[in-house]
């Protein structure tokens, strides 16, 4: 069973909260959910929507086609009516609204919709869009949201303005009734979201007054499987991973979609801290600093790391561009700092609230000169949690910056994660070569066989840090022999990491290893491809790359042998993964499925693309799904 549900309305009217309540309630009934929220770079007023896929087994993707659409305004109907295939819940008050009256809609999109409706013989109003949907076997459910909101206001004896947002509860209540699930799960989800009695009572009345508007359609039954599951988004997964992994300092400058991670850490600062030297535990807090800009943010994190605490920062493309100067300083001084890089659409400001995978090559080679950096890329929320910890361990073990890539899709999507996938029993801190103190002979940049020097914290020994090339003590040096040796010392750490980190842990492989088709991907498209692999008849081996530096070249090269087609699936124009594969293995990728319109890969559009590539032999397919 797989069902697609979408809720949409004006940004700032509680769409995200309503979707989370609905998702929580469905998950509580035992179902798996994958959800993604899309929103404009606008505080209030523009179109926002949340897509949820509900299934009785693990699900990792959404589709373009919608089973149930919940709309509150005219724009949501106009934006999504074409994709609805079963039920469309709409606001009765907007039926006569003309598309030209929707000022918030992109003019290009409005013209396309007007042209479509006109050619199909319908008027360019909400009514016309609804008639088209009805003619295509969609069940229409008109709702008088204002009437229910007024009824609740009268019953609660509060102004109508107070009950405005119960309209969202009406929409999700009707949806929940259509599913046929026990309404008590919905009430519990509402009460866990709202803490004030007034709002709890208001919303419970809204549930009561709207529950009988429709009859059950899907007749879902609560799952009998008793399993511990988490329902969380990518920002939260990374934040919890950092807290669990021992971060004690987090700096940031507000930027979408990275800020939510730091806000979560700030709200959960109280932790049990462990002394890195003695292992003693005591209560403490995580320091979270909102810096004046991104360069200050990374410099603060670097300074904190030098004192011995696990330190990190979080940013997105424009912010990372500003951090690069500090990144180079950290590379020169072998500072174990972690940067969580939330990828959004560029260049420049680009698409601030939309997704992309265009920043892949950039972080691997960011900075002037050459210095080692480890680059990880998470593919789902469980990986995002574990990779946040892995990044901290790698940074300290190899005394080098680590960049953790998380796309906007992963950051702002939600899923139900089985507890065991987090593998908490396998997670532990690895702090590398730490010395409690150093005498006069201590050399912070001592030459060693593996390039990794014993690390003392500030205040524990005499040491010098500078952006210039330096000798073992840290003093500035332009000596030719020292320059060669110190440069090699730094770069050798990446070679050591390449030898020590098993290539099998830097990738994940799914499907039939003997397939003639190999698909190479990374990040969020992995989940879409896994769903296709598990539920469709496509024949391919799926290779997910989880670490791009050091690149798992030997394993990737071996997996490419004997294939008819080697296909990359990624969210950028240049097929950057194929460029890296060619660079590291010397082998060519034969086909690419690409997308750069700012929206995530959707299962149905990707299935169509795979047919074009695998069966029809197209070399390059560009996708443009989403709204």
Swiss-Prot record:
Quaternary organization: Heterodimer composed of an alpha and a beta subunit.
Q: How is its activity regulated?
A: Inhibited by low concentration of 4-fluoro-7-nitrobenzofurazan (NBD-F).
Q: Where is this motif: YPITP motif?
A: 253-257
The cross-references to Pfam families, in alphabetical order and at most eight, read: POR (PF01558), POR_N (PF01855)
Write out the GO MF terms.
2-oxobutyrate synthase activity; 2-oxoglutarate synthase activity; pyruvate synthase activity
Q: What EC number(s) has UniProt assigned to this enzyme? A: 1.2.7.11
Q: What is known of its domains?
A: The Tyr-Pro-Ile-Thr-Pro (YPITP) motif is important for the turnover of the reaction, presumably through its flexibility and mobility.
Q: Which organism does this sequence originate in? A: Sulfurisphaera tokodaii (strain DSM 16993 / JCM 10545 / NBRC 100140 / 7) (Sulfolobus tokodaii)
Protein name according to UniProt: 2-oxoacid:ferredoxin oxidoreductase 1, subunit alpha
Known role: Catalyzes the coenzyme A-dependent oxidative decarboxylation of different 2-oxoacids such as 2-oxoglutarate, pyruvate and 2-oxobutyrate to form their CoA derivatives.
Residues given in the record as substrate binding sites: 256, 344
Record's catalysed reaction(s): a 2-oxocarboxylate + 2 oxidized [2Fe-2S]-[ferredoxin] + CoA = an acyl-CoA + 2 reduced [2Fe-2S]-[ferredoxin] + CO2 + H(+)
The processes (GO biological process) annotated in the record are: response to oxidative stress
PANTHER family tied to this protein: PYRUVATE FLAVODOXIN_FERREDOXIN OXIDOREDUCTASE DOMAIN PROTEIN, PYRUVATE-FLAVODOXIN OXIDOREDUCTASE-RELATED
Q: Which InterPro entries match?
A: 2-oxoacid/accept_OxRdtase_asu, 2-oxoacid_Fdx_oxidoreductase, Pyruvate:ferred/Flavod_OxRd, Pyrv/ketoisovalerate_OxRed_cat, Pyrv_Fd/Flavodoxin_OxRdtase_N, Pyrv_flavodox_OxRed_cen, THDP-binding, Transketo_C/PFOR_II
Alphabetic keyword roster: Oxidoreductase, Pyruvate
- The broad enzyme category this protein falls into is oxidoreductase
